[in-house]
């Protein structure tokens, strides 16, 4: 809430800024040099995990509209859950806004 002198000006109702989600798989990066042998995770009978991919996610900071970019490795079902949360009431803050409003 903003405190100040009374005015006769009526502001339009607050609307959330439009949110654009760019969720797409990221191509795997080929590494050069020595690599540690990959271990297979223990098998889980009766539980089929979804195939995990790396997704690049860009969301605006809720404080200053700066674009925040990060990658996540998850299944398509989980990235859709993240998308649903972002379209509802989950907001991200950049480190500057977190310090100022934390």
Swiss-Prot record:
Region (E7 terminal domain): 2-36
ZnF segments: unnamed: 61-97
PTM: Highly phosphorylated.
InterPro entries in alphabetical order: Papilloma_E7 (IPR000148)
GO cellular component terms attached to this protein's record: host cell cytoplasm; host cell nucleus
Keyword field contains tRNA-binding: no
GO molecular function, a single term: protein domain specific binding
GO biological process, one term: symbiont-mediated suppression of host innate immune response
Positions of short motif Nuclear export signal: 79-87
Superkingdom of this protein's organism: Viruses
Compartmental location: Host cytoplasm; Host nucleus
Entries under SUPFAM superfamilies matching the protein: E7 C-terminal domain-like
Domain observations: The E7 terminal domain is an intrinsically disordered domain, whose flexibility and conformational transitions confer target adaptability to the oncoprotein. It allows adaptation to a variety of protein targets and exposes the PEST degradation sequence that regulates its turnover in the cell.
Annotated function: Plays a role in viral genome replication by driving entry of quiescent cells into the cell cycle. Stimulation of progression from G1 to S phase allows the virus to efficiently use the cellular DNA replicating machinery to achieve viral genome replication. E7 protein has both transforming and trans-activating activities. Induces the disassembly of the E2F1 transcription factor from RB1, with subsequent transcriptional activation of E2F1-regulated S-phase genes. Interferes with host histone deacetylation mediated by HDAC1 and HDAC2, leading to transcription activation.
Subunit structure: Homodimer. Homooligomer. Interacts with host RB1; this interaction induces dissociation of RB1-E2F1 complex thereby disrupting RB1 activity. Interacts with host EP300; this interaction represses EP300 transcriptional activity. Interacts with protein E2; this interaction inhibits E7 oncogenic activity. Interacts with host TMEM173/STING; this interaction impairs the ability of TMEM173/STING to sense cytosolic DNA and promote the production of type I interferon (IFN-alpha and IFN-beta).
UniProt record similarity statement: Belongs to the papillomaviridae E7 protein family.
HAMAP family, alphabetized: PPV_E7 (MF_04004)
Protein name as catalogued: Protein E7
Organism: European elk papillomavirus (EEPV)
Gene assigned in the entry: E7
């Amino acid at each position: 809430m903003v405190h100040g002198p009374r005015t006769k000006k009526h502001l339009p109702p607050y609307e959330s800024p439009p949110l654009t989600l760019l969720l797409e798989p990221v191509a795997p990066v080929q590494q050069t040099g020595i690599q540690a042998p990959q271990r297979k995770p223990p098998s889980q009978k009766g539980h089929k995990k979804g195939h995990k991919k790396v997704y690049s996610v860009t969301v605006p900071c809720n404080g200053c509209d700066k674009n925040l970019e990060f990658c996540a490795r998850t299944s398509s079902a989980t990235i859709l859950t993240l998308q649903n949360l972002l379209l509802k009431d989950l907001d991200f803050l950049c480190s500057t806004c977190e310090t100022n409003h934390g």
